[in-house]
Structure formats: structure tokens, C-alpha cells
Amino acid sequence: MREYNIGISVIIPNYNGLELFPQTIPTIFEALAETKLENEIIIVDDCSTDDSVKYISENFPSIITIKNIKNSGFSKSVNIGVSHSSYQFVLILNSDVKLTKTFFTNQISHLSNPKVFGVMSKIIGWDNDKQQDGATYPILELFKIKTSTSYSYKHDDNQARFTTYLSGANMFIKKDIFYEIGEFDEIFSPYYSEDTELSIRAWRLGYLCIYEPKAICRHKISYTMKKSQKKKNVDIIYNRNKFILHELALTGISKLFWRLQLFIELIFRIITLNFRFIKSYILYIKMFGEINRSIHRFNTNSKKLKQNKSFTDVKNFKFNY
């Protein structure tokens, strides 16, 4: 496995995030300064129309800016950013997130464990301390993957814990493992479920995902999405990507029964004229070629690493780290 220089690269995929930059970017510099490590900030601009790039170049000239030729979505933008990064520790960060001063210093010790893929912090409100996200555990409910069930809300004792997934809003990972397990799958472009799938893939290939509540960031929920997308389009892509997630994460009898219940649900949605769900299903079916290529890539990596846990194995992890 290739070795990279020790330091921190912050990757920010951006679409029209200019309005929040004056509030977010200074907090990143402050948190990086606390680490005493070499660092860089890379913004991958996804064809913004709000002068984001101009603002960054004029006000933060040390930030590296990469401009996508066409709007490509979250997973591709992050992959581009990581490919241009210089350091082993990579923070994937939404443009609508503010960091606290000790954000990195409370997480970085976990990355010394060779089996840890990455860490995520506690996510609280932009203007309040209400928790938005934390450690989650996976559930198969009628063969549907549920990853939003949080046990950190009930056990918020400031203890680091295992978590099913690392949120794409603040995913602090190791670059060598990111490449070893295969980067973000761009099949999920433009958005949704790519962080969940990557995290489950890491678990299945023998790595660990950690939640560290002592590290905190503030998030303005779906700020960019609300500005750029219609709810109808968001719903269609959300459902399509949930279907793809199940195809990639499930195996054997679990996948067979999931497909059966999905077909039954499709019949009900047709009867009730739920056209958004139907459109999502059609898009999912059209992507079977890409889905199979993704499965093939996973199987190739699985053979190299000699690891191939099922989703059932993943959901049996112990909560305490």
C-alpha cells in the first residue's frame, strides 16, 4: 500500500457556497492550526454560478481551487479533490459546515490504528447545540437497510464508538485505505448514499469506522441542496440511490428477498400512481450494467485484501470502541 506524507488535506466539494464561506473557512484554518501538522485546503468547484471561485482566490489565496468542466456531483468532485491532495489524512467536508477549534485534535489519534478507515465528529446545529448526527448502527428491516438509527443520542457519554457510516458532511479518513477500498463510487452521482456505501464497503473489507463525540462541527442542513435542486428531483435520486445501495451492500438470500419486497412495493406504487418512485425504479434498472461493474470492483478488492464480510457480519459489530 502506498505511503503518503503525514499532514491533513481538507477537500470541500462546492456548488454555490459563497454565502457561507466567510463563516466556514476561517474555522477550518483555526482548527488546522491546532494540529501543528502540514496542511492544505482544496475546494473542488462544481460549476458554481455565485462567484465562489473569485471570492476564494481574492480572500484565501493559499486555498487550492479546482474547477470542474461540468457539474459532476459529490462523489466525483471528492474523488478529484483527493487525487490532487498531498497528505495521508483527508477531511471530506461540506461547504455548509463550521469546525470547532479542537475538531482535528480530538480525532487524529484514532487514525493511528491501522484498522481504522476513518472518523466522524458529532454534528450539531448551525445556531444551536441540537445534535443532527452521531454514531449509528445498521438494521435490516424487512430486508431494507436502515442506517439512520442512532445509539449515540441515548448514550451520549462522550465515548468514542463504532458507527455504521461516516457522514460525508465531515468524513476524516486515511488516503491509503480510501484508495485500497476503491474511492467513492461515482454511480451515486450527483448525491445521496455514497457516504453510506463507502463506509459499509470499508467494514466489509475489514476496516473500522469510528464516531468521536468530543470532536464537534456545526452544520446548516441541506443548505446547498435547497438552493440548487427541486424536491421532486431530490426524491427521485434519493430513492434510486437507495436501491443501488442495497444492490451493492447486500448478498445472497438477503438481496433476493430485498428485490422481492421491492417488486411488491413497486406494484403498490403503480396502483397509487406514485410517479416519483416509479421513475426512481426505472433509473435503477437502467443502471444494472454499472451496478454489476461496481460489484466486480468490490470482488476484486475483496480478493486482494482477503476480506469479504456480509452486511449481516457488519451489523453485528459491537457498539463500544
Question: Could you tell me what each predicted segment is?
Answer:
Residues T164-G182, I187-I216:
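A short, conserved alpha-helix in the catalytic core of glycosyltransferases
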Residues V90:
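Short aromatic/hydrophobic "clamp" motif used to bind/position activated sugar donors
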Residues N233, I237, G252-Y321:
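Non-catalytic, C-terminal membrane-associated alpha-helical segments of glycosyltransferases
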Residues L140-T163:
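Short, flexible, basic/aromatic active-site loop/helix in glycosyltransferases
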Residues T27, D45-K54, K70:
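A conserved acidic beta->alpha catalytic loop
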Residues G17-L32:
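Short, well-formed alpha-helical segments that are part of the catalytic scaffolds
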Residues N68-S85, S95:
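Glycine-rich, basic loop-to-helix element that forms the pyrophosphate-binding segment
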Residues K98-P138:
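Conserved donor NDP-sugar-binding/catalytic core segment of glycosyltransferases
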